[in-house]
Amino acid sequence: MKKLIILSALLATLAACNNLENNNQQTVSTTTVVNTLNSTSNILQGIAAYKQGDMIGAYNALKNLSPASTNLETYSTYLNVLQNLNKNQELLTALKSGSEYFGSSKDYVLNYANILTSKFNDTNTATNVLENYLKLYGNNSEVEKSLANIYTSTKR
C-alpha cells in the first residue's frame, strides 16, 4: 500500500513537471523529484523504525541525512540512533554538522553539550558550546544551569 501511494505521488509529480514543460515555465528535473521522494521515504522509514525500537533499521534509513535537508526533531532522532548504536565517530561528526544549522536552538545546544559530557566526557568542548550560545543569544537559565553543572562537576 505504501509503495502504491509513493508511486501515485511520483506519477502526479511527473505529470506536473510535464505540464510545466509544456507551458514553457521553469521545470523541475525528474531526477530531482525522484531524489526528493526517496529522501522523504527514507526519513519516514527511519522515524518509524526508531519508534518501533529498530535502531539498525532507523540507522540504515537515516544514515545519509543532512542537517541542511531536515528539521531539528528529525535530526535529533538521528543523533539518538547514533548514540544507541554507539557510532561515536559518526555522532561527533553529526553533532558538529548539526551545530551549523541548529546552533541557534537552545534545545540543540543543550543536547549537544549533554552528549559531549555524558558520552565523551568532553567538558571543555561542552563548555565552549554553551558559552558561545550565551554570547550569541544572551542569558538563558537552562543553558546557564547546564554550564554551572559542568563547572561544579569538573572542580575537585
What does each model-found stretch correspond to?
Residues 2, 11-78, 84, 89, ...:
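N-terminal leader/linker segments that initiate helical-solenoid repeat arrays
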Residues 67-68, 101-102, 136-137:
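Structural marker of alpha-solenoid helical repeat scaffolds
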Residues 55, 88, 122-123, 156:
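TPR-repeat structural position
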Residues 52, 85, 119-120, 154:
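Structural motif corresponding to the intra-repeat A-B loop/turn of tetratricopeptide repeats
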Residues 77-78, 111-112, 142, 146-149:
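Canonical tetratricopeptide repeat
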Residues 64-65, 97-98, 132-133:
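Canonical positions in the second alpha-helix
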